Amino acid sequence: MGSRHSTYAHRPFSKRRKADDTEDSLAEREQQEAIAQFPYVEFTGRDSITCLTCQGTGYIPEQVNELVALIPHSDQRLRPQRTKQYVLLSILLCLLASGLVVFFLFPHSVLVDDDGIKVVKVTFDEQRSLVILAITATLKIRNSNFYSVAVTSLSSEVQYMNTVVGSYTTTNISLIPPRSEHLVNFTAKAEMGGPYSYVYFFCTLPYIGVHNVVVFVRTSVKISYIGHVTQSSLETHHYVDCGVNSTAV
């Protein structure tokens, strides 16, 4: 009776041991299949270093920094988040910068206005019955650009009765700052005599208080900015007192 009981006691233990052995063999087989799929290669020689990331004492080449990693196309690292937003923002910033550059550099108008005659100096030549007028006029130049402009030349003609009696020309006058106004003064010398010698007698009449004559002034101004040259012309009529020196208030 004792011997039979002992046999029955060892039989469940034997079955459990066989089951454990079967599981171990299956696990070992799976490990072998995994290793066969990704074989471990050991490099030996002078150009090898110890593998720091693998389990074991294998070696990998020293050219480890030159190894190329293959990343699947579905990897999220290849699809940064908000890419479309960043691209759209970059395009908008570029358009904004371009618009600002065009706005500030686009040539605006430079206006030239007549500011009147300021000073008239009168000289008489009695022998030749000649009246000499030194006429100082002023131009108002308004720069609407966001950069400076240069007044490169100015020329003026003084006419009396459709005849040129005086002229004035100058170059490299001034530089006008951005978004500002600038006054340019110039003096043209006019001589009225010869066929207009009657002007001398009119201007020297003592019993006339004001000796006004009408002169026609044609002025041309050249302005340069950013490689662009423009020309503005003015044509004005002025009353000039040829009897005495005068100054505009």
UniProtKB/Swiss-Prot annotation:
Q: Where in the cell is it found?
A: Endoplasmic reticulum membrane; Membrane
Organism (species): Bos taurus (Bovine)
What are the start and end residues of every segment in region (Disordered)? 1-26
- Report what the protein is called: Transmembrane protein 106C
Q: Where is the lipid attached (N-myristoyl glycine)?
A: G2
Assembly information from the UniProt record: Interacts with TMEM106B.
A GO cellular-component term linked to this record: endoplasmic reticulum membrane
Q: One Pfam match, by short name?
A: TMEM106_N
Q: Which SUPFAM superfamilies match?
A: LEA14-like
Which terms are listed as keywords in the entry? Answer: Endoplasmic reticulum, Lipoprotein, Membrane, Myristate, Transmembrane, Transmembrane helix
- UniProt topology in membrane: Multi-pass membrane protein; Lipid-anchor
Keyword Transmembrane helix part of the UniProt annotation:
yes
- For whether the record's keyword set contains Transferase, the answer is no
- Spell out the InterPro entries in the cross-references: TMEM106, TMEM106_C, TMEM106_N
Q: Which family does it belong to?
A: Belongs to the TMEM106 family.
> What is the taxonomic lineage of the source species?
Eukaryota, Metazoa, Chordata, Craniata, Vertebrata
What Gene3D superfamilies would the database entry show? 2.60.40.1820
**Residues that span the membrane, as ranges:** 86-106, 197-217
Gene field: TMEM106C
